[in-house]
Amino acid sequence: MPITNHTSRRNVLRGLGAATALTVAGCTDSTDAGNGANSEESTDTGGDAEITAAWVFNSEVGDLGWSWAHNEGRKTVASEYDWLETRFTEAVAPEESEQVFRQYADSGVDIIFGCTFGYQDPMATVAEEYPDVYFEHNTGYTTLENMGRFMGRIYEARYLAGQAAGLVSETDTLGYVAAFPIPEVVRGINAYTLGAASVNDAVSTKVRWTNTWFDPPSESEAASALLDEDVDVMAQHQDSPAALTEAADAGIWATGYDAPMGEQAGEHYLTSPIWHWEEFYGPTVEAVRDDEWEADAYWKGLESGICSIDDWGPDVSQDVRDEVAATRAEIIEGSLDIWAGTEFEGESDEFLFQEMSSYVESVDGEVPS
């Protein structure tokens, strides 16, 4: 598995070479920014880079999904700071990630971002070996002196999408194609359902699990099974738009995840909970540059801008838009507690983040063990 190590555009123009690569046998790299696997974009436009940051993604960047959203955040901060050099490697399986983290640490980067849950233990192993390198793990629970963790309260955006779903549903039955039965995903299902139930007492959510983050055939199959159960709004927690397009093709409302997916759903698009990871990456690389970085457990929500819902689909009524906008304002100002009235009311952030493992009342069935 290669890690790309792209020099700055300024140095390219000076004729000092386009890129070098640290490689693992059997893999190649590309230095043509934005074109294919392992490509790299450098945005050092003024002087030599003072800070070098590396990102490791579990899937290909592509044009949609989890890794795409993270890479958009990387590109945004790279374009904003002329003192920052960025590198990334995509499509790294968790079992391969330790080697990639170690290669980046050996290459002299200042900070490494690992962007999937399965990287937690491999990153912790490497972080202990390289105390002078900073590490940030996305979605996990572990922190070390030189390893922080970060996530956004995307469940707040899911609550808003769920409220919209409850307002447009005619069968009172929502479908949810879920990834893995971990607290992150369970939180999303619960928040989505609570949002719907806040405007529709009769609503229920049916869930199908794929046990994958990216497997379009499995996602389509799960969505198809839900269509047979009279759902008329579909939600998902995967990188691809497969569940969304299955729903749109069947003529029902659909909500995506991670990235804007209106083009894939057309007139049946409701909205999507989406990420703006630059809201974390920017302050973090600034802290590294200013020698103020500290390992912490970042978990902010709508108020920070790290997450939101996408633009509305073309057929979403103004009444729906207005009601959801009012709810969004209540969440941001702190007057609405999403978990109020549920078994999770009053639970700590630690519990909500690490231990939520059961459904709220309006979700059918039980969370798989």
Task: Please tell me what each predicted stretch does.
Residues 1-131, 137-146, 167-173, 187-190, ...:
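Terminal disorder- and signal-encoded targeting elements
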Residues 49, 150, 298-300:
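Generic detection of short hydrophobic beta-strand segments and adjacent strand-loop junctions
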Residues 79, 272-276, 292-293, 297-303:
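Functional cleft and adjacent loop/helix regions within the main domain
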Residues 142-164, 178-181, 266-279:
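Short beta-strand elements at the ligand-binding edges of bilobed clamshell
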Residues 180, 210-211:
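Subtilisin-like peptidase catalytic core
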Residues 182, 298, 302-312:
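Internal, active-site/partner-interface "lid" segment
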Residues 214-215:
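Membrane translocator/pore-forming domains, dominated by Gram-negative outer-membrane beta-barrels
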